């Protein structure tokens, strides 16, 4: 079977301060920074995975990074996107309520067919009331978008949004990632929602064991 390199443009969208840039930094190199200086302008992060058929799946991830209020620039970021990952702070009702506006603006540029993933970030925070999935779906008017609770701080479920999108783009619902090219497998911390995710972790562990020693 011929191995391929597949490339997709993905937008990270949501209010400022919900953890978009922190999340993508976590995916790229395992780094978590609670405090950082927001980047001015769009930033394109290449995020690469290897699947179980040897294909390289590359996501060109566009982070709006501090430009959320500049409507003209947002259109430029969205054009040509294959899909989007929307973020909100699971402890902040206003960031959840704003999801509907973000989705509407994205779909006005890209259309309604591009797949969408919704991420409730900061699920690790203790002693604060968290927004329920039911409320999120009410805000999004019952749209059946894929939904994940994640933590950029602990890396909880941080790869599942990309895994879900890869399955849609390739038409392979059983696709698994055998490695995150950007990060050592030992950094992965998943909540196993299905046999497929469990199988993914098994592959990651095997890949780690087979890696040559320095």
From Swiss-Prot:
GO terms for molecular function: GTP binding; GTPase activity. Pfam families: Ras (PF00071). The keyword Transmembrane does not apply. Its main location: nucleus. Residues 34-42 are annotated as: Switch-I. GO terms for biological process: protein import into nucleus; ribosomal subunit export from nucleus. Keywords: GTP-binding, Nucleotide-binding, Nucleus, Protein transport, Transport. Belongs to the small GTPase superfamily. Ran family. Found in a nuclear export complex with RanGTP, exportin and pre-miRNA. This is GTP-binding nuclear protein GSP1. It comes from Encephalitozoon cuniculi (strain GB-M1). The lineage of its organism: Eukaryota, Fungi, Fungi incertae sedis, Microsporidia, Unikaryonidae. The gene is GSP1.
């Amino acid at each position: 079977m011929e191995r391929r390199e597949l490339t997709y443009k993905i937008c990270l969208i949501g209010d400022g301060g919900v953890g978009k840039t922190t999340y993508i930094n976590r995916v790229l190199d395992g780094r978590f920074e609670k405090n950082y200086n927001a980047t001015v302008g769009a930033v394109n992060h290449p995020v690469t995975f290897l699947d179980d058929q040897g294909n390289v799946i590359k996501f060109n991830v566009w982070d709006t990074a501090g430009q959320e209020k500049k409507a003209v620039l947002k259109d430029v970021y969205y054009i040509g996107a294959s899909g989007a990952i929307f973020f909100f702070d699971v402890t902040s009702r206003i960031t959840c309520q704003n999801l509907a506006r973000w989705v509407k603006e994205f779909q006005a540029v890209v259309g309604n067919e591009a797949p969408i993933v919704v991420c409730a970030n900061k699920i690790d925070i203790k002693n604060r009331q968290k927004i329920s999935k039911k409320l999120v779906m009410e805000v999004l008017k019952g749209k059946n978008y894929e939904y994940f609770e994640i933590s950029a701080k602990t890396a909880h479920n941080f790869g599942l949004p990309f895994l879900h999108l890869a399955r849609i783009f390739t038409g392979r619902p059983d696709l698994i990632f055998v490695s995150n090219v950007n990060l050592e497998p030992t950094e992965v911390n998943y909540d196993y929602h299905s046999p497929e995710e469990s199988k993914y972790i098994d592959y990651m562990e095997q890949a780690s064991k087979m890696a040559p020693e320095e």
